[in-house]
Amino acid sequence: MKAFIVLVALAMAAPALGRTLDRCSLAREMSNLGVPRDQLARWACIAEHESSYRTGVVGPENYNGSNDYGIFQINNYYWCAPPSGRFSYNECGLSCNALLTDDITHSVRCAQKVLSQQGWSAWSTWHYCSGWLPSIDGCF
């Protein structure tokens, strides 16, 4: 019983992977990273629908065995190297684990690369973001 209590205490003390942002904190951080202001509402919409603004999310396995990582749910078959060592084109040149941290710099840079090569439709949730977008006007 003591061992169980110790294990529970250790599990609770262990730092959680990632963090949860909100629309405004995401918009401000992305703006500070140089993302054009006219894109910020779209990125906020995508992050809301892909991960609920959570940086530590690994999505369920896709039909082809790949997974999606981080706040923008970036796919490990094309864009990042999975921890399993499975083949990846790794177009962003980074480990998928880099997309799960509190620092969103890698996620933002990789997402911008996805956008430049495939457009907004690279995200399956884009149809939620093609009309009304969340306002970021009060965020700055």
Curated annotation (Swiss-Prot):
It comes from Drosophila melanogaster (Fruit fly). Unlikely to play an active role in the humoral immune defense. May have a function in the digestion of bacteria in the food. One of its GO terms (cellular component) is extracellular space. Pfam families: Lys. Gene3D superfamilies: 1.10.530.10. Residues 19-140 form the C-type lysozyme domain. Belongs to the glycosyl hydrolase 22 family. Keywords: Antimicrobial, Bacteriolytic enzyme, Disulfide bond, Glycosidase, Hydrolase, Signal. Found in the midgut. This is Lysozyme E. GO terms for molecular function: lysozyme activity. GO terms for biological process: defense response to Gram-negative bacterium; killing of cells of another organism; negative regulation of innate immune response. It catalyses: Hydrolysis of (1->4)-beta-linkages between N-acetylmuramic acid and N-acetyl-D-glucosamine residues in a peptidoglycan and between N-acetyl-D-glucosamine residues in chitodextrins. SUPFAM superfamilies: Lysozyme-like. The gene is LysE. The active site is at E50, D68. PANTHER family: GEO02684P1-RELATED, LYSOZYME C. Residues 1-18 form the signal peptide. Disulfide bonds join C24-C139, C45-C129, C80-C96, C92-C110.
